UniProtKB/Swiss-Prot annotation:
Residues at which substrate binds: D181, C215, S216, A217, G218, I219, G220, R221, Q262
Modified residues (Cysteine persulfide): C215
PTM sites of type Cysteine sulfenic acid (-SOH): C215
Swiss-Prot/TrEMBL keywords: Acetylation, Endoplasmic reticulum, Hydrolase, Membrane, Oxidation, Phosphoprotein, Protein phosphatase, S-nitrosylation
One Pfam family named in its UniProt record: Y_phosphatase
Keyword Flavoprotein part of the UniProt annotation: no
Residue segments, region Disordered: 338-359, 378-398
Organism of this sequence: Homo sapiens (Human)
Record field: compositional bias (Basic and acidic residues): 338-351
The protein's name in its UniProt record: Tyrosine-protein phosphatase non-receptor type 1
Positions of post-translational Phosphotyrosine modification: Y20, Y66
Gene giving rise to this polypeptide: PTPN1
């Protein structure tokens, strides 16, 4: 297959980063004026992940119709997707209002609520303990009917009720729970098995509204999911499956939402998934059983919230190159700590968060084409960290040490100055008396 040869050639030449940069430069750019309005600032998770004006989803609200979501219509594939950010605490009601108004049957979630100790998404669906959630701002009620937990994904059956009309609808929530915090899945097997589960449910069928797909920013993992699905669909529809050009398909999708596919690693993984998925499209039905076997979906799932590893304690008076900290100027140590923060393997997804704790700068293996975070701070801010109770801060200790060191010298200088001034005055007085 031509695509497989292309993949091997790119792998051999190590040119994934260059190809990814070409896509970034060729991608369409359209206005995002509505997203930038001051009143919508608290509805965006990231400053620089915004829906284009021409493709944004509009809520049926009179006061404000804005939600950070984009409609992607792939006409040849006859597939539509709504790509959106992970809901914020203040936009959960808007999220379900969009699902209701767009008549969507499926929601695909590709992140965990917490990753790397950061909140990636609000808990916008009810858990077993509570069973239901009511969104008063949009007058909707969501009830958990059942959930099927596998080793790497969970399928939830939800009931969404419009409290104004008393109408109810079934919503299927497909939650991929094991996308690694750093990078992409090792193998496309589990990803493809998950994708085909979504397909088999009918949630992607045109008789329903567009499937809603999200991660944290709604561009990286979400773009990977939609790109793989669209390419496999085009392979199935065309007489010549090898004519499908992944790069062209991605550029077409980027006309509807910015930044789809965030890293070269995600682009490479998309190729892998399409190449492997094409085996099923070409008639090898046994590969689906292989995906299921390789993905180990019947094993015990990992915990939902994995606490981040503790950060090492900061050094206070430890030796540094054979010398102690107290003999160095304080600002040198502050700079060192700030640099340590920068060197930590932090990642993620585009822009400074507005409504959540800062998300790290994602490496070339996660959702991060433009997302960034400010690490450290000004020197003054670093020195202003509160000391332990009852113990003076490090700058205060240094000041006391410096004062005790210079005190004898300063006293001697003062005495010498007074004696010199006195001698001069006596000389002037005696000189004037003689004249």
């Amino acid at each position: 297959m031509e695509m497989e040869k292309e993949f091997e050639q790119i792998d051999k030449s190590g040119s994934w980063a260059a190809i990814y940069q070409d896509i970034r430069h060729e991608a369409s750019d359209f206005p995002c004026r509505v997203a930038k309005l001051p009143k919508n600032k608290n509805r965006n998770r990231y400053r620089d992940v915004s829906p284009f004006d021409h493709s944004r989803i509009k809520l049926h609200q009179e006061d404000n119709d804005y939600i950070n979501a984009s409609l992607i219509k792939m006409e040849e594939a006859q597939r539509s997707y709504i790509l959106t950010q992970g809901p914020l605490p203040n936009t959960c009601g808007h999220f379900w209002e969009m699902v209701w108004e767009q008549k969507s049957r499926g929601v695909v979630m590709l992140n965990r609520v917490m990753e790397k100790g950061s909140l990636k998404c609000a808990q916008y669906w009810p858990q077993k303990e509570e069973k239901e959630m009511i969104f008063e701002d949009t007058n909707l009620k969501l009830t958990l009917i059942s959930e099927d937990i596998k080793s790497y994904y969970t399928v939830r059956q939800l009931e969404l009720e419009n409290l104004t009309t008393q109408e109810t609808r079934e919503i299927l929530h497909f939650h991929y729970t094991t996308w690694p915090d750093f990078g992409v899945p090792e193998s496309p097997a589990s990803f493809l098995n998950f994708l085909f589960k979504v397909r088999e449910s009918g949630s992607l069928s045109p008789e329903h509204g567009p499937v809603v797909v999200h991660c944290s920013a709604g561009i990286g993992r979400s773009g990977t999911f939609c790109l793989a699905d669209t390419c496999l669909l085009l392979m199935d529809k065309r007489k010549d499956p090898s004519s499908v050009d992944i790069k062209k398909v991605l550029l077409e999708m980027r006309k509807f939402r910015m930044g789809l596919i965030q890293t070269a690693d995600q682009l490479r993984f998309s190729y892998l998934a399409v190449i492997e998925g094409a085996k099923f499209i070409m008639g090898d039905s046994s590969v689906q059983d292989q995906w299921k076997e390789l993905s180990h979906e019947d094993l015990e799932p990992p915990p939902e919230h994995i606490p981040p590893p503790p950060r090492p304690p900061k050094r206070i008076l430890e030796p540094h190159n054979g010398k102690c900290r107290e003999f160095f100027p304080n600002h040198q140590w502050v700079k060192e700590e700030t640099q340590e923060d920068k060197d930590c393997p932090i990642k993620e997804e585009k822009g400074s968060p507005l409504n959540a704790a800062p998300y790290g700068i994602e490496s070339m293996s996660q959702d991060t084409e433009v997302r960034s975070r400010v690490v450290g701070g000004s020197l003054r801010g670093a020195q202003a960290a509160s000391p332990a109770k009852g113990e003076p801060s490090l700058p205060e200790k240094d000041e006391d040490h410096a004062l005790s060191y210079w005190k004898p010298f300063l006293v001697n200088m003062c005495v010498a100055t007074v004696l010199t001034a006195g001698a001069y005055l006596c000389y002037r007085f005696l000189f004037n008396s003689n004249t």
